A protein has these predicted regions:
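Active-site cofactor/substrate anionic-group-binding motifs, chiefly glycine-
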Residues: 11, 20-21, 27, 160-163
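Conserved PLP cofactor-binding pocket of PLP-dependent enzymes
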Residues: 157-174
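Short, hinge-like loop/turn segments at secondary-structure boundaries
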Residues: 6-8, 36-39, 101, 149, ...
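Conserved PLP-binding catalytic core of the aspartate aminotransferase-like
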Residues: 110-117, 124-157, 173
């Protein structure tokens, strides 16, 4: 699903709070491909934008975008930044190339949406709850054992269906 960023924006302004958007799954996949803030027309209203280069961009690493005060604080206080190494030029180049493709070839997003629509229709036809809002299709199995068995079955059929288990999800919702 897509976070109700319009409502979160209103709340952030009402309570004088910073608005942070983690777009791990939205970059290159929803709306124009520019992420959740762009989807809602709130690009200029987000205080902290973070995301990954590893999902739709096919690279590694991530990013944080914010004003200079916030970035300076993170550079000096964030242990995960202080004790890590910079991305390699090849990884940055791969992410930039993917961004260039997304910007220059709008058919990529069109093909993705066609695939999302097809997948949603197929899941619904099998009696599995699905929506075509995003290209992520959580399918709740239940127990860890059953979920791992389904994941193994899919893998042997040539399909990557990662088993998400506790503590990532609540017990019984694998």
């Amino acid at each position: 699903d897509i976070a109700p960023l319009d409502k979160l924006y209103e709340l952030s302004r009402e309570y004088n709070a910073l608005l942070m958007v983690d777009d791990a799954h939205a970059t290159g996949t929803i709306g124009s491909g520019h992420g959740t803030a762009a989807y809602y027309g709130l690009e200029k209203e987000v205080d902290i934008q973070l995301g990954t280069l590893s999902k739709s961009l096919g690279s590694v690493g991530g990013y944080v975008a914010a004003n200079s005060t916030i970035i300076d604080y993170l550079v000096n206080m964030s242990r995960s930044f202080i004790f890590s190494t910079a991305l390699s030029p090849a990884d940055i180049g791969a992410a930039l190339a993917a961004l260039h493709i997304l910007e220059s070839d709008t058919s990529v997003l069109g093909r993705l949406q066609e695939n999302v629509n097809y997948m949603a229709l197929q899941l619904i036809a099998m009696g599995i709850e699905a929506t075509n809002e995003t290209p992520i299709f959580p399918i709740l199995i239940g127990s860890n054992e059953d979920t791992l068995a389904v994941s193994d079955y899919l893998y042997n059929a040539g399909i990557i269906g990662t088993a998400i288990r506790p503590p990532t999800v609540p017990v019984g919702e694998s």
